[in-house]
């Protein structure tokens, strides 16, 4: 089964349309399980991560883990106030993007639409704080104070209401592409690996809670105990006003990470494979931790030899995250190739 941008884009859309903020990944888990079930038995860890062995391999061969995080950023209701909802962030969110954003409140009685709002500057007092901060924002539910108090409660989860859209040049924009596009790349690689049946054992981990600490990756790595692992996440793509030395172009290929927490030999092996097989590659050196699940996986159990592949993404942690599916396809191709060429 060949790896195509069309299949990856379709998988990414399906995953992005399933809500799954950190710690509440159930709907996203179900969508991912549907995509992975044809390749092997899907198991759920106690922390809500997904594990699936897609190739048993030969006895004594290395065990490779392919990982991406399933959770997304979101919000949690902190207080119901006169029909409006006060809320806090789940994960890192740029508050400047939030005013007038449509959201969905996932309450006990069902899902309800809302709009993020605030007191208009021209109606606020002269001494009011007009800056865009989470504590200055509310969610307008449209309900009366009495009805809202019955429907909503502190602890309810909120996600962006937007769905992925296709831009020119087949690029995708929308919420949750961090890291559902990484999940789609891992699933595409898994399909290829399951069909080719290489010598090494290959397990897929789609982890929970990356945006709040990486607990799903750490426990998933401990459970699976691989020899090697490739974490797939997103990193800063180019955009208007962004320094080119701090970003990588969309469409330029997967970003290979270099960091003290990553295994140098394994990383260079992937670099060589990409160069020998004309897979576009960009380079992302980091002086310390990577800020991804690779850091937690590296120290799981007895330790795992890690590599990191990142897909360039614009407007990170917003409702309009933007990627080029071809970068995800090349990420998947490199992972599949790594299983065929050995370690």
Predicted regions span which residues?
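N-terminal hydrophobic/helix-forming segments and targeting peptides
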Residues: 1-343
